[in-house]
Each structure stands twice: as structure tokens, then as C-alpha cells.
């Protein structure tokens, strides 16, 4: 390292060569030759797909800064767990009929290797959305089904309802993502024999069924007389227990914690009626739900007992919901917990035999703006540097003479100050309030602060730009470059040896 060749008239200043940026760059280049590239088919005994729902690039950057600041650092230099993975790339997320996508079409692409329409789960693009008849004979095989068919162990975890679009695309075929329980089915769907998503989960009969299923959404499995949504009188949790007599059905974090990973057979955990709590809400209000890290850790312990290996899909489903509600605090704290869960998986597995992929299904219209000084609180108001490059003492004022935050949204419900309320969904109870507000006396770092937005909409929208993908283990290098989202399936299938010869 160090100085250029003898015949050069350039000489490096010692400060340049001893700088941590310079040393760090040299170290990365030097380490590259140790990096394993494994092209061999079937080299990954285990495959774990982590999906941060709505975790676009700006979300990753802001979550990285927040996580670093929570540890007392400036934040910008921090790395989330998955950012240390050796390979990364970009993913094009559009659906076959939609420029900015939804979670049903995107997760179908990742799980089945082909893009499809927005709102459609596990069904080819030739089907019409919400038309049962048009979807028949157009079901797509998923990576989870292939793994089950090979005798591998399988798991699906989500902080959203387990019947929600992302987890559903691992096991269900439905031309309408909203058919989560039979109350949502149209007359046409019933007449043509389409089954609701919860029913498909419980009656999943490939291999010995999905081994570990954890998430929210209990209401879609229970009849109305038991507080559920079903109108057919069926209790699908009872049906699951009958089908898996040695299985364990759990409904609380305490019951889940009591499970013995070394001996438990199959597990169905439905921890909430609808979505599970946001992570900050779960912690602040001591809710009896497992964290995503706890669910991930124990699932790997259970699934790794199978000598044939396993396929596991882990969704942080509520990064997306925080953004839809215009709550950066909630989206980012869920993203930090997602990073913690990925760290747990990295610690419990080896890059020799386990492919871990981390990605998002789509982005959100969430921006990191202004010229804040280094280490400025990411949830705070912009404080810029003065003409000598030193931080000012007060927040900057915009041309309207009011301060402004670093983080904001292009559209959505807009500003609200709900103080210490940790449930971002409380925002939906109040009217939209878009445009500029005087934030001088507002604590923008509080859990209940919802950022300003420009275009008034009942919910903030997804965004259409590419999302990141990060990977470690056999086949990870195949995700470098800018690729279609459907490639994710092909990498998992190749590295995991999931496709028959």
C-alpha cells in the first residue's frame, strides 16, 4: 500500500494514507480475495429469505443512522447487520400491470420466479384480479413448496397477519390478496371453488405441511362467534391441531418462549387478532408477543434439527405499515429490529451451507432531505453547518421562516403530533393535514410524531424505484447487479437445489 511507483512525481500526504477511510478501503480490497464464490447447484443446505416490507433504500439509510445514534455514534458510519454481507445488488420491483408495485405481485415474483399482476398471489399474470375462474389452472409453484416436496423443513414468519400478501405468497394461490378468510370471498369465487388464504394455509398438504408458522391474523382462522371473521363456522386452529396431533398451537409470547426448540414438533403461533404490534409499541407497552428476533432465533433452532435442511421466510411486515401511516419513527424502529433478527440468523448459521438473502418487496415515498450536520438526530429538525463547516446552534429555517425535518413523505395523511403514542395506526383516526406546519415547538423525535406530507392521501404510497438485496452464502454472488425481482427465486432454487433434475 502507501506510495505510488518510484517513477511517479505524486506523493501521498501521511494524513491521506493514515486516514480511517483510506485504511478501510484498503482492507476491503485486500479481503476480497478471501471471498468464496460458490456456483455449485445445491450447495446451500438451508435457505433463509428475509423480506423487509417497504424497506426501500432511504429506509435502510435512515435505519442505519438511527441504529448508530441509539448506540451513541454519529450514525452515518454505522452498518446494519445485513450491510456487512459480501454481496448486494438492486432489484426492479414493478408488477406486470403496475409501475409502482404492491406486495402480492412482488412476493409472488420472489417466491415463484415470475412477475404477476398487483394484488394477485401465487397465480400467473394471465389471471384477472379477483376473478376466481380466470385463475384456475394458473397456480405457480413456490420455493417453499419445492422445499417441502424435497423433505426439507419449512417455516414462515411475519409480524403482519400470516394471511397477508407477503407471507401468503409462500403457500397460497389467490387472484385476490384480500381473500384472507371466507368472509371476503365473492359469490363467483365460492361458485368456482376458490379457497380463502387461511384455509389454504391450514390445508397445505405438500410434504408434512409447513413446520413453523408464526405471525398475526388469528381473526381469519376463527368463526365470528369466537371473535373471528369467518362466516363458515369453522375454527381453523382446531382443524390445524387435529391435523397435527403432535404440534403446538401458541397464542402469546410467554407460550412461545416456553416451547422447547429441541423437542417441539410443528408450531402454529397466531399472536394477535390482526397484525402483530409495532416493535416500539410491543416494548413500551409490554405486550405479550414475541419479538421478530425471538421468533427468528427459535424457528432456526427448530428447523435446523432436520438433517435435510430447511427453507425459512421471515417478514418484517410493519416497516411498510409505519410508512403508510406517515410514521418514520415506527418504520425505522421496526427496521432496526429486523436488522437484529438478521444478526441472530447470521450468528446461528454458517455461510458454508446457508444462503441468507435480505431484500424488500418495494420502497416508499420517504426522503432524507436538507443539509443536516454530521450526526444530526435523524428524526430531528435540520441543523445545517455554517460557512466554516461547523454546526449552527439552531435549526435552519426554510423560505417560509419555519424549521423543517430531515425525514418526510411525498404523500399521505401528513402532520400529526400524537406525543407518546407508539401505535402509528392511531393516525388513521384523525383527518389528513398536509402541507407545512410550524414545528418550532414540536418534538419531532417523539414516537407519536408523524412527518409532513405534500399530496393528501388516506395512506402514504409505495414508491417505484429499485430496492436493495443483500446476500451471504452459496449463490449469494448471483444477486449482484440490477436484476428483475423474479431472479430471487431462481437463485434460491439453484443454490438450494430445489428444482428437480
Model-derived features: positions:
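Marks the mature luminal ectodomains of secretory-pathway proteins
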Residues: 135, 149, 496-497, 501
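His/Cys-centered metal/cofactor-coordination and adjacent catalytic loops
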Residues: 122-137
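Intrinsically disordered, low-complexity repeat regions that act as multivalent interaction hubs
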Residues: 116-119
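A post-motif C-terminal structural segment
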Residues: 15-26, 40-45, 55-61, 65-108, ...
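Alpha-helix C-terminal capping segments
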Residues: 111-113, 145-151, 348
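Short glycine- and acidic-rich boundary segments immediately preceding or forming the N-terminal edge
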Residues: 1-41, 149
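Structural beta-sheet core signal
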Residues: 49-50, 156, 358
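Glycine-rich phosphate/pyrophosphate-binding loops
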Residues: 139, 144-145, 149-169
